[in-house]
């Protein structure tokens, strides 16, 4: 049985995620008080094998220790995943301004900016327990729904999921990355006229980068690092590890390196996922 707990700051996309899971067959409950969570799970345990609930700042206990006790009281037979959504303060302010919605904490005589910052502190206990963190800054509604399907429903087992993500430094480092590697020192296909319009998924770019000893060594050293520490990460009960590879624009070098790493680890690891952030823009 699976239980997905969705939380995050207001405006980060919790409702979108919940609707996506409902479309995929999950029994969904929106904004349930945390102290009712054990009752809900015990009630539906015999009727549903996939349940998703969203929890916002209004439904958290004041004592962080109480939250831990409630989560620990949930049925041990359930496979629980805590998904935490977030976005930058500027993006959240923009979203509230566009929708003209009131922030849940605005009734406490706080400015919108102050309410957003206060919410971050109040949600810290559940954010710290999150198995999966998703930054929705640059995601459309459809991209967020697809990412959730990929990250959660794409899991093939209870083992740790390796996520390899390419990105461009000029667009910012992914906030959900556990490890970040800089590939900007590698030979750049951008300066080759025939390769410039292509991506790291195209054969000519693969041949160009694959023939460079420095590229091969870079990939091998990342493989060695991840392989060395992967058993320790698994023993730590991690659900996801995101390895982000960045180049300038996220089009050639980082894409190629991610593809090579994913290809290598997929032969020995049951759950490997790929995301090319800039190619999906």
From Swiss-Prot:
The keyword GTP-binding applies. It holds the Pfam family PapZ_C. Keywords: ATP-binding, GTP-binding, Nucleotide-binding. InterPro entries: P-loop_NTPase, RapZ-like, RapZ-like_N, RapZ_C. SUPFAM superfamilies: P-loop containing nucleoside triphosphate hydrolases (SSF52540). GO terms for molecular function: ATP binding; GTP binding. GTP binds at residues 56-59. ATP binds at residues 8-15. Displays ATPase and GTPase activities. Belongs to the RapZ-like family. This is Nucleotide-binding protein Patl_0571.
């Amino acid at each position: 049985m699976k239980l997905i707990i969705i939380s995050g700051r207001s405006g980060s996309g919790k409702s979108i995620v919940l609707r996506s899971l409902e479309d995929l067959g999950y029994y969904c409950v929106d904004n349930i008080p945390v102290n009712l969570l054990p009752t809900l799970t015990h009630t539906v345990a015999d009727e549903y094998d996939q349940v998703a609930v969203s929890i916002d700042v209004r439904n958290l206990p004041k004592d962080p220790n109480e939250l831990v006790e409630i989560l620990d009281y949930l049925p041990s037979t359930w496979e629980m995943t805590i998904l935490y959504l977030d976005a930058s303060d500027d993006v959240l302010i923009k979203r509230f301004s566009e929708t003209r919605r009131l922030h849940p904490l605005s009734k406490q005589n706080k400015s919108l900016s102050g309410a957003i910052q206060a919410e971050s502190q109040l949600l810290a206990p559940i954010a710290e327990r999150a198995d999966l963190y998703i930054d929705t800054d640059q995601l459309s509604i459809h991209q967020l729904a697809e990412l959730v399907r990929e990250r959660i429903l794409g899991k093939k087992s209870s083992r740790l999921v390796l996520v390899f993500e390419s990105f461009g430094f000029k667009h910012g480092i992914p906030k959900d990355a556990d490890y970040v590697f800089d590939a900007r020192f590698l030979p750049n296909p951008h300066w080759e006229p025939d390769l410039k319009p292509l991506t790291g998924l195209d054969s000519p770019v693969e041949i160009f980068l694959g023939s460079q000893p420095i590229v091969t060594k870079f990939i091998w050293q990342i493989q060695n690092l991840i392989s060395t520490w992967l058993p320790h990460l698994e023993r730590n009960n991690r659900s996801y590890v995101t390895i982000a590879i960045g180049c300038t624009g996220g089009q050639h070098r980082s894409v190629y390196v991610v593809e090579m790493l994913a290809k290598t680890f997929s032969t020995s690891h049951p759950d490997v996922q790929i995301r090319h952030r800039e190619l999906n823009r």
